[in-house]
Amino acid sequence: MSGKLGDDALDILFRDARTHNGWKAEPVSDETLRALYDLMKWGPTSANCSPARIIFVKSKEAKEKLAPALSEGNLKKTMAAPVTAIIGYDVEFYERLPELFPHDPTAKNWFNWSKEWAEQTAFRNGSLQGAYFMIAARSLGLDCGPMSGFDMRKVDDAFFAGTTVKVNFLCNIGHGDPSALFARSPRLSFEDACKII
């Protein structure tokens, strides 16, 4: 791979991108959600394990199902967002490794020997995929509002009962209302966050 993105693209993905709390009344099509996933799925994960599982909450009924799990500060903005993505991770992701990692038919055994190790792997790589999700959304012209203020057990019971999937975080997506943004917060400098050794 060669070449690099220009400043306009980098602004869209990072420098000008914000966490949105207010939303315009503009729908997000199912086709756009499919396109979003079809971008994010190419991001790297350990042994291509791809543990992320996503539920796109769009309907009024589904939003009402989600509402009891939300913290007070996240309720209004989530109800107003065109889509709320429940980003989950499958703790038994390894069952799909014969399909996803055909280079080595024993790859499933790298993870299924320990529930703790499998869940750590699923959470770590599912979190990576959650970041890819937001970058893919921004690249398609959508804004994001990731959240961790919710009751995990309530979300799991309402949306993942009877499965091996657990919620990681929630992410509202749509077209953000810039008038609802806070002033941008600072970030750590390179010197504060990094070392070259």
Swiss-Prot record:
Pfam families: Nitroreductase. This is Putative NADH dehydrogenase/NAD(P)H nitroreductase Plav_3612. It comes from the Bacteria. It comes from Parvibaculum lavamentivorans (strain DS-1 / DSM 13023 / NCIMB 13966). Disulfide bonds: none annotated. Keywords: Flavoprotein, FMN, NAD, NADP, Oxidoreductase. The keyword Glycoprotein does not apply. Belongs to the nitroreductase family. HadB/RutE subfamily. Its cofactor is FMN. CDD domains: RutE-like (cd02148). One of its GO terms (molecular function) is oxidoreductase activity. The lineage of its organism: Bacteria, Pseudomonadati, Pseudomonadota, Alphaproteobacteria, Hyphomicrobiales. The keyword Flavoprotein applies. Its EC number is 1.-.-.-.
